[in-house]
C-alpha cells in the first residue's frame, strides 16, 4: 500500500518537473511566446502551434529575435524543445534554420522593423518579418520566468509538506527505538554519552509528557490534544501550511498575462492553495487508515494519527475554500463569471469543496460520539464525493498531472479495506482438517448486567489468535441493516474454555474454564502489535478454545441496540452474530519496570486487566522485572467493581505483589466492601498524591516505574500533569503510557 503510493507520488514528481521549462530553454520560449501577440500573413495562420512551426514569416521572426537575445547554448536547447513540441502538438516539423540563412545575416536582421509590446494590433496580419524590442523581450521573459517559478514552487511546497511528516514519523520511530533501548539498558549500563540521555529526558519532561499548556487542560484554542508534543506537531504543520500559502510570489507591473499585481497575486495564490490542498489528500487517507504502517513504526496510537488526520483535513479544506473564492473573484473581474462557473470541471470542483466542508459539522466530538453510525455514513459519503469531484475538477489538464495526488488516496483506501477483510476472515473463520466440523466461525454470548450497566461480551474466535495486553478489536454485527459498521473495543480478558461459550456469559462453567495464568509460560515470541514480545499461547491443548472478553458500556447507536436485544431476553443473555476484526494495538513492555501503577476509569479497566494477567503469567517463571503493581480503579457503580474483582481479578487479589484501591463515584454509594477483604472508598482518588507517592518511592529505591492510564480525558489529564510534576522533581525513571481510543 505505502510502496505503491510512494511510487505514484515519485512518478508525479517526475511528471511535475517535466512541466517546468528548463532555464536554458526559457529564452527561446520567451521569444516565440512574444510573437503570439502578433499576426503574420501567409499559411498556416490558424491555431497556436501550426503558425509557430510552419508560417515562414512567423518562424523567421522567431529565429531573428533569438539570434539577438539568446546565447548559442540557449538557441540549441530552445529550438530542440520547440521542434519536439511542433511534432507533439501540431504533427509537423519546425522549419529548419537553414532555409532562412540569407535572411538571418547581421545586416538583414538590422534592417527588420522593431516593435514594442502592444504597438501593433494582433488582428492586423504583417507581411514582413518583425523584431521584438529588448524591452518587449525582457517583459515576456520575466513573465515566463515568474510563471515557471510559480509552477515549481507550487509543486515544491507540496512536497515540503511530505518532508515535514517524514521528519515527524522518523522522530517517532527514533523515539520508539530509544524507549526500547532504555528499557533494555537500565541504570547499571547507561549509554556512553550521558549528555544524550539528559537531552532525551529534557525532551520527555518538557515536550512529550506535559499537557499542551501549563495547566492540565487538554484544550488549546478550540482543539483538544492529549499531550504537548501532539499540539506542537499539529501547530507547526499549521504554521508551515500558512507560510507556504503566503510566500514565494514574483509579481511585477509589466506582466503580460496579468498587468495588475493584484490579479497576479489572485492567480498565484489561487493555484498555490489548490495544489497544496491536493497534496494533502494522500496524507488525509494515510492517517485515517487502521492498517497504517506508521502506527507500527512509531508505536503511536491510532488516536494520535486520527488527530493528524483531522488537522490535515482542516487545512486541506481551508485551502480548497480559498482556492474557490479567489478563482471566483478572478472570474468576476474578467467578466462572464456565471457562464464560466457553468463549465463541468468547475462545477465538479465546487461540489468537491462543498463536500469537504460538509464533513466537518458531522465530525465534531459531540455529534460523532452520540450518533457514530450517522457520522460514519456521512463521513464516507462526503469523502467519496469530494475525491470523485477532485478527479473531474482537474480532468482538463494534459496527462492528468494532478491525478497523481489523488490515486494514492484510492490505493490507500482500497488496500486498507482489503486488509480489513483479510483480518476479518483470519479472526472469524478457521479450517480444521479431520474434524467433524471443518469450518469454525466466531461464536458469541452477550449478557447485560443492569446493576453495573455493562454488557459482558464473550467471543470464541474461529482462528488461533494470540491475545496480548494492549490489543483492541473492531466488532461487527453483520446481519443488521448497518452490518458493515464496526466499533472498537479493548480486549479486557481472555481464557480457554472446553467447547463453545456458555449460555450464561457471566456464569461460565468454572470447571471447564482455564485462566491463562494457569497455562505454562512458553518462550517469548513477537506479537503482531509489538516488537517487545508477548506470551505465546498458541500451543494450548487442542480441545480448549480461546475466549475473548469485552466490557461494553451501552450509550447510543449500536451499543444501545445490543443492550436492548439483551433486555428482550428473559435471562438478559443472547447469542448474537458478531465478527471480530483485529488485533490492533501495541503492547507496552510493562514487565521491564520494577514498579507499575495502573489507573483505570470505568470500563477503562479493560486496558489494565490484561497486563495483570500477563504479569501473573510471567512471574510464574521469573520472566518479569515487576516487583509490585498498584491498581487504582474508579467506577460509577459498585456492581462493576464487585463483578470484575470477584472473577477476573480474583487471583491477582491474593498476591503479595498486587494491591488495589477501588473508588465509587455514585452519589448513592456508601463506603463498604466489594468482596471479602476488599473495600472501596467513595469519591474520586487524589491522583496527584498517589502518583507523587509512587514516583517518590520508586526514586528512593532507584527503581523504574511505569504509570498506565485508561479512563476519561479528565482523569488522564490529571494523571499526565502529576507525572509531569514528578519528572520535573527529578524522577527520571518514570514512564507514562496513556491507553485511549478516539474515533
Curated annotation (Swiss-Prot):
The keyword Transmembrane helix applies. Glycans are attached at residue 103. Heme 2 binds at residues 323, 393. Residues 411-590 form the FAD-binding FR-type domain. Its cofactor is FAD; heme. The chain crosses the membrane at residues 154-174, 193-213, 229-249, 275-295, 312-332, 344-364, 377-397, 402-422. The gene is freB. SUPFAM superfamilies: Ferredoxin reductase-like, C-terminal NADP-linked domain. Belongs to the ferric reductase (FRE) family. Its EC number is 1.-.-.-. Residues 503-540 are annotated as: Disordered. Ferric reductase involved in adaptation to iron starvation and which is most likely part of the reductive iron assimilatory system (RIA), a siderophore-independent high affinity iron uptake mechanism. One of its GO terms (molecular function) is metal ion binding. Disruption phenotype: Reduces ferrireductase activity and decreases biomass production during iron starvation but not during iron and copper sufficiency and copper starvation. Increases sensitivity to hydrogen peroxide. Residues 525-540 have a biased composition (Polar residues). This is Ferric/cupric reductase transmembrane component B. CDD domains: NOX_Duox_like_FAD_NADP. InterPro entries: FAD-bd_FR_type, Fe3_Rdtase_TM_dom, Fe_red_NAD-bd_6, Ferric/Cupric_Reductase, FNR_nucleotide-bd. Residues 273-389 form the Ferric oxidoreductase domain. Residues 1-18 form the signal peptide. Heme 1 binds at residues 309, 379.
Amino acid at each position: 500500500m505505502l510502496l505503491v503510493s510512494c511510487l505514484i507520488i515519485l512518478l508525479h514528481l517526475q511528471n511535475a518537473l517535466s512541466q517546468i521549462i528548463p532555464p536554458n530553454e526559457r529564452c527561446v520560449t520567451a521569444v516565440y511566446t512574444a510573437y503570439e501577440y502578433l499576426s503574420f500573413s501567409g499559411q498556416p495562420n490558424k491555431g497556436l502551434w501550426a503558425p509557430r512551426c510552419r508560417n515562414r514569416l512567423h518562424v523567421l521572426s522567431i529565429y531573428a529575435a533569438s539570434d539577438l537575445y539568446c546565447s548559442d547554448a540557449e538557441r540549441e536547447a530552445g529550438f530542440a524543445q520547440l521542434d519536439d513540441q511542433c511534432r507533439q502538438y501540431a504533427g509537423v516539423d519546425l522549419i529548419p534554420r537553414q532555409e532562412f540563412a540569407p535572411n538571418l545575416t547581421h545586416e538583414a536582421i538590422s534592417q527588420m522593423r522593431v516593435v514594442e509590446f502592444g504597438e501593433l494590433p494582433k488582428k492586423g496580419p504583417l507581411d514582413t518579418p518583425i523584431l521584438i524590442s529588448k524591452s518587449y523581450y525582457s517583459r515576456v521573459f520575466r513573465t515566463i520566468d515568474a510563471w515557471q517559478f510559480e509552477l515549481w514552487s507550487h509543486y515544491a511546497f507540496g512536497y515540503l509538506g511530505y518532508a515535514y511528516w517524514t521528519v515527524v514519523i522518523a522522530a517517532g520511530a527514533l523515539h520508539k527505538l530509544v524507549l526500547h533501548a532504555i528499557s533494555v539498558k537500565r541504570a547499571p549500563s547507561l549509554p556512553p554519552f550521558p549528555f544524550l540521555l539528559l537531552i532525551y529526558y529534557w525532551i520527555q519532561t518538557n515536550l512529550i509528557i506535559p499537557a499542551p499548556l501549563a495547566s492540565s487542560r487538554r484544550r488549546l484554542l478550540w482543539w483538544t490534544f492529549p499531550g504537548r508534543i501532539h499540539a506542537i506537531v499539529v501547530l507547526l504543520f499549521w504554521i508551515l501550511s500558512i507560510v507556504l500559502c503566503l510566500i514565494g510570489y514574483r509579481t511585477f507591473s509589466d506582466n503580460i498575462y496579468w498587468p495588475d499585481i493584484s490579479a497576479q497575486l489572485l492567480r498565484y495564490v489561487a493555484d498555490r492553495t489548490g495544489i497544496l490542498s491536493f497534496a494533502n489528500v494522500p496524507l488525509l487517507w494515510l492517517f485515517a487508515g487502521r492498517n497504517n504502517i506508521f502506527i507500527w513504526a512509531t508505536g503511536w496510537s491510532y488516536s494520535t494519527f486520527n488527530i493528524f488526520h483531522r488537522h490535515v483535513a482542516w487545512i486541506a479544506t481551508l485551502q480548497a475554500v480559498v482556492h474557490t473564492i479567489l478563482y471566483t473573484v478572478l472570474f468576476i473581474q474578467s467578466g462572464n463569471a456565471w457562464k464560466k462557473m457553468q463549465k463541468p470541471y468547475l462545477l465538479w470542483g465546487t461540489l468537491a469543496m462543498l463536500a469537504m466542508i460538509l464533513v466537518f459539522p458531522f465530525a465534531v466530538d459531540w455529534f460523532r460520539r452520540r450518533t457514530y453510525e450517522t457520522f460514519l455514513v456521512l463521513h464516507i459519503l462526503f469523502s467519496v464525493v469530494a475525491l470523485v469531484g477532485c478527479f473531474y475538477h482537474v480532468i482538463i489538464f494534459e496527462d492528468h498531472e494532478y491525478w497523481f495526488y489523488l490515486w494514492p488516496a484510492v490505493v490507500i483506501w482500497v488496500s486498507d479495506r482489503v486488509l480489513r477483510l483479510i483480518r476479518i476472515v483470519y479472526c472469524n473463520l478457521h479450517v480444521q482438517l479431520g474434524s467433524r466440523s471443518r469450518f469454525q466461525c466466531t461464536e458469541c454470548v452477550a449478557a447485560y448486567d443492569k446493576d453495573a450497566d455493562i454488557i459482558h461480551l464473550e467471543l470464541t474466535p474461529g482462528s488461533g489468535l494470540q491475545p496480548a495486553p494492549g490489543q483492541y478489536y473492531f466488532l461487527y454485527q453483520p446481519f443488521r441493516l448497518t452490518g458493515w459498521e464496526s466499533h472498537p473495543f479493548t480486549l479486557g480478558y481472555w481464557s480457554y474454555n472446553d467447547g463453545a461459550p456458555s449460555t450464561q456469559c457471566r456464569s461460565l462453567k468454572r470447571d471447564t474454564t482455564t485462566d491463562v495464568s494457569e497455562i505454562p509460560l512458553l518462550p517469548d515470541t513477537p506479537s503482531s502489535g509489538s516488537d517487545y514480545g508477548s506470551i505465546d499461547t498458541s500451543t494450548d491443548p487442542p480441545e480448549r478454545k480461546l475466549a475473548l472478553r469485552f466490557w461494553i458500556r451501552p450509550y447510543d447507536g449500536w451499543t444501545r441496540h445490543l443492550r436492548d436485544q439483551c433486555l428482550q431476553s428473559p435471562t438478559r443473555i443472547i447469542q448474537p452474530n458478531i465478527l471480530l476484526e483485529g488485533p490492533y494495538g501495541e503492547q507496552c513492555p510493562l514487565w521491564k519496570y520494577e514498579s507499575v501503577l495502573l489507573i483505570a476509569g470505568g470500563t477503562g479497566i479493560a486496558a489494565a486487566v490484561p497486563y495483570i494477567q500477563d504479569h501473573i503469567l510471567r512471574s510464574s517463571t521469573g520472566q518479569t522485572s515487576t516487583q509490585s503493581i498498584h491498581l487504582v480503579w474508579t467506577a460509577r457503580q459498585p456492581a462493576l467493581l464487585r463483578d470484575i474483582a470477584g472473577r477476573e481479578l480474583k487471583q491477582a487479589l491474593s498476591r503479595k505483589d498486587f494491591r488495589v484501591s477501588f473508588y465509587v463515584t455514585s452519589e448513592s454509594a456508601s463506603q463498604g466492601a466489594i468482596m471479602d477483604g476488599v473495600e472501596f472508598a467513595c469519591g474520586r482518588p487524589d491522583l496527584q498524591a498517589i502518583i507523587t507517592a509512587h514516583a517518590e518511592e520508586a526514586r528512593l529505591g532507584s527503581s523504574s516505574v511505569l504509570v498506565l492510564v485508561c479512563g476519561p480525558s479528565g482523569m488522564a489529564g490529571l494523571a499526565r500533569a502529576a507525572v509531569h510534576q514528578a519528572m520535573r522533581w527529578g524522577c527520571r525513571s518514570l514512564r507514562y503510557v496513556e491507553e485511549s481510543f478516539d474515533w
